[in-house]
């Protein structure tokens, strides 16, 4: 692809040669967000393009002048080339009129994509072509560099804009590299990737303009470079010169080697928004007044900045009485209503997960607060989630039940036993049983009944999540005896201390594993480099984060917690021609986790070697004693033990800059821009469908579709194979029967088709190298009779417990027996942790 020159000052559009060659990536014209985000940004953006008369009278003249100008010649030529390529595929969608305006070209692309996208079901080339068209629509409306720098709507931080202007020649050189080297791959990703960029991440500017793809990456890289201290710069690239630092960030971001969290992509470099993703709160309220004050003073400011919240309310544990007639549920209803109100006008909804322990007096009410389980509207809380912070004792008693012991009980306590929340392990078990003997419990029920209530709620409502209290405390980097950790975050992958004066705060980014493939093999050196860049990038952004509360500022100051994750594990395994169940894939899975941890820790140690101070409390941490996260696990096999030994010595001598390093989050949003599989999970389906106000958006499994094209070179045979998959609910096994080992199609299983015990075991393989946790969901298919037994889910939770995992269950996703095999979107999810 010929290079594209950056736009000169004042130019209407940059010179951009006709786009030819392999299909590139694109963005769709209309809203593709979930109903929760309606009206979404893309819909609003297109409304301003197609019907500017609806805009304010002040803005309309400028918008009219820009949008009614002729579509740039380079975009028109590229559009003509793409339409010709579509005609070669048998799809003639016409063409815009000669000399069409920007508005007319955008409207034409909108209609073309809406008419073509349904063909993605049978032809992956159309899916990619639609993406290319959307990219062209973005280019038809993008601002020039000067307009972008000066945009009041974008509101660049003055220091960031000044740095770009000061080093403009170097920035423009980076842009030439981008259009020549990085953009062709982005352009070829697919429709969903392009849609996600246009709808969510590219800023909308004045007069119908939008942020360009290259400007988006400039904004992120320039913000990070401006915030990077000299020691960070030396760790990153060996130079503290701003242009060198900018280049290092820009190339890693533009090639999608690293993908920042959604708050960073939205707000980095801008004088608005907060950059942190995850907030953990434990305000310790004991009364209704204290609980309401915590919600309004601590939770609301975070939600208004679009952060996701994990909130411990274990301390609010009063049985109904004269001055507290509804226990915790009145407070949860207030929290639910506030969350709904804040999300009602948000382009990016977020959420709250409330943490309680399973001995909380109101735990059954919490389990019944969502969906059909809510007894009446006054108790319904569909806008928040719950998670059980579950001690080992619960699983030990359930195991006794499984072993045949009769009348195994589980006891609920009120605030007379509030000190149990600060205990874990044997200390908790001894005190819990002492309180039982004293008769202080408010109620006892059979352990199997309690287990059933948990599973029923998870299966029917998507909540509660379940985390292992003792595992989280056992593996924490400081001693938590007598001051147990009480909460995780919204998506169950962050493990931090939270107190009334100090929130846990974590800043996130992920490494895109498919970007680490080279020559048909996995490049561990590339992974290590990406992990180091991600660590320095997030540390730099942490310095300029606009945190919503004083307790959040204190949490960042003390721990500097990183959450570097991964995405595209299943995509990578497929690209290496492996099945997730292959022993080689199991080994690769663990090796990737080890290399990720090493890369992040190595960078963090080097920051201290170059003069930065270790995190507050390092001297009391396990790191100071030479203990690594994996040392508490049995039978851990290291790829290169000697380098870990050397790292221990370096830590003992210099310290480590960050208190925490690796968190494996879901990456729902960011894996859409890379078209990679989410996080560490297998893909949910071979044909994803999302229904929005403008129709159905399909996302085929591109590697599967490309494999079918190779296996069935005759078009009629390929179409027949696709039809078989369609009839078989997009299950390869159901469509083609039992395939021999090594068959090119045999590896295309979905998360619902894999043995869930295998997926849990793979989490356990990674666990020694994940000092936070992993957002592990369960993917279960309902039996033909429609009855999913609670014992099946509990069996999986017991396996997670016995393997020492910290997260036992994030979502419990159920595929109905009558499902058509096309996994539908629209679930209530948080884009802060999902990246």
UniProtKB/Swiss-Prot annotation:
The record marks 810-811 as: Important for electron transfer. It is an enzyme of class 1 (oxidoreductase). Substrate binds at residues 262, 277-278, 308, 489-493, 666-670. Disulfide bonds join 278-506. GO terms for molecular function: ATP binding; ribonucleoside-diphosphate reductase activity, thioredoxin disulfide as acceptor. One of its GO terms (biological process) is DNA replication. The active site is at residues 489, 491, 493. Belongs to the ribonucleoside diphosphate reductase large chain family. Heterotetramer composed of a homodimer of the large subunit (R1) and a homodimer of the small subunit (R2). Larger multisubunit protein complex are also active, composed of (R1)n(R2)n. Ribonucleoside-diphosphate reductase holoenzyme provides the precursors necessary for viral DNA synthesis. Allows virus growth in non-dividing cells, as well as reactivation from latency in infected hosts. Catalyzes the biosynthesis of deoxyribonucleotides from the corresponding ribonucleotides. This is Ribonucleoside-diphosphate reductase large subunit. It comes from Suid herpesvirus 1 (strain Kaplan).
